[in-house]
Amino acid sequence: RNFANQHGAFSHPLFTALRTDKITVASAGRLLKNYDAHASHLRRLLLKAATIMPESAVGFILENVRNEYGNGIDSERHQLQLQDVAFSAGVSREDYKSYSVEKSVKTFIKTVTPLYFPIEQHTAKHAPQFKKQTSALSKAAIAAGAITATELMAVEEFKALQIAFRQFDLQDHIWFDHVQVEEEHSGDSIALALYFLTRHQSFEAVEFGLRGVLDANIHLYDGLLATIKL
């Protein structure tokens, strides 16, 4: 956690903007559409990451995945909760659908994919340089570091987003239960990272995944910031 806190992602201007800037309805829609795009991709990557974990490490991921998908109740999926925040803020369904995903957010998605799922046949196709860098590292440990970075940053993201949506009197919307949920998930992800650090001494691999996602988050935050600065 201390390692991650020292990274520039934690002090990205996005967080100040979310806490202080006036956000229009259109900006709120663009912001949430882009957050939706990144979160939807990460949910799928979590499922992939679970498939390369040792049996004894899978449990650290399952609760997170199940919660994201509404604990088995389709209407409680987190994606639907996010979209309801947008609609409750006054964004029309037509406008929400029409908003584009920022180039920087697409760069984030492309960058984090091999960190969550760093198997040879994937990285050889999509990230050959990554394959060379990680040839001697535990692929599951890289994914563990990536997941840990995501969950640590998610806590900060939701705290700032909750403040931003006070402007729409939506700070108590169920989607912002994520502030507590992500605190719990960050504990699970840190436990996952510690599993590889203590049982497999995979420090270099965990750090590679952790740092890689933190670096990628700069692209994500650049894209999200652009949506509220237009």
Map each language-model feature to its residues:
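Non-heme di-metal
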Residues: 1-230
